């Protein structure tokens, strides 16, 4: 059974003020073409369909068109991610089932499943929406769970993985040891980390949440990554669609098909004169790419953004890196990169004020306090 694995569409996303709708539509057409070529038996959408819990009208319209055409090619299984509203995404779910679209309902203590079959027998596809410990604790108040790993283990405990069937899981969590990008939502310390061992027994685990395609602790546990580059930390990514081919139980093959963006997202560095030299950009895709330009001139270039924009009209970010900017950089700002979690930022502030880092006991206490506040707000 061939499965097409997608996640983190983030429809309606804006990157540095630029709308990605046209770029998303361009790549979604490629995905539809790939689905028609590869003819998968099921298509898995593993969360973060939208970029916001209340998506824009144009994002909803784009997904409606994409989903309608996708469901004509194969059954579609969808779970909600941390950027989605589980309630809004699940609206009309029972009606959608008649059109071969299966959406994870709001979590109520059970994990919904879809059963498909091929020449090797049945395949159970389990739909686990994005969960925090608080969501699971509400449904299992007497269960012991200190970590998100405990919570996910409890949530999956009702699935019989010893029935001889092949089992596929859709999930939207951060698996410990995986590589993050700056465009992803940060957790408090390691509070949302999930050990890959909770997925033991599944034949394939289709993950969403992280933007870089990667295995997560084992070959059968995988993130497919985003279809587009959504931050400059992804500038070197090669975006693709993942296909998982399930044979008889225990037999799994993974392949990928590349995706090409309408506009690439790149980082440029150099002096103003270097970047504006015709021989530098002629014959390249730089004038049509989204760019973060870092000028290394020692003096600010007057009207730099406007002047650079005559050659590079899609500049998302302009910054300087020279002796002056490095000297005036605040020590905390120098360390507080966009990928720092809230706990890491507290740790940096504590170190700046006290000339030492928090000890383990202080970190654990702070993590529990912040986690408790976040859970109370859910």
Q: Which residues fall in each region the model found?
A:
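Conserved beta-sheet core of the metallophosphoesterase superfamily
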Residues: 95-98, 181-252
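Conserved catalytic scaffold of divalent metal-dependent phosphoesterases
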Residues: 91-192
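Divalent metal-coordination and catalytic microenvironments
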Residues: 8, 28, 48, 63, ...
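Active-site neighborhood of divalent metal-dependent phosphoester/pyrophosphate hydrolases
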Residues: 40-58, 75-87, 167, 173-190
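Accessory, non-catalytic peripheral segments of nucleic-acid enzymes
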Residues: 37, 42, 246-378
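Metal-dependent catalytic neighborhoods of phosphoester/phosphodiester hydrolases
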Residues: 16, 49-67, 80-99, 105, ...
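N-terminal active-site segment of His-dependent metallophosphoesterases
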Residues: 1-66, 71-72, 361-372, 376-377
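Active-site neighborhood of phospho(di)ester-bond hydrolases with catalytic His/Asp-centered motifs
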Residues: 6-7, 43-47, 76-82, 102-107, ...
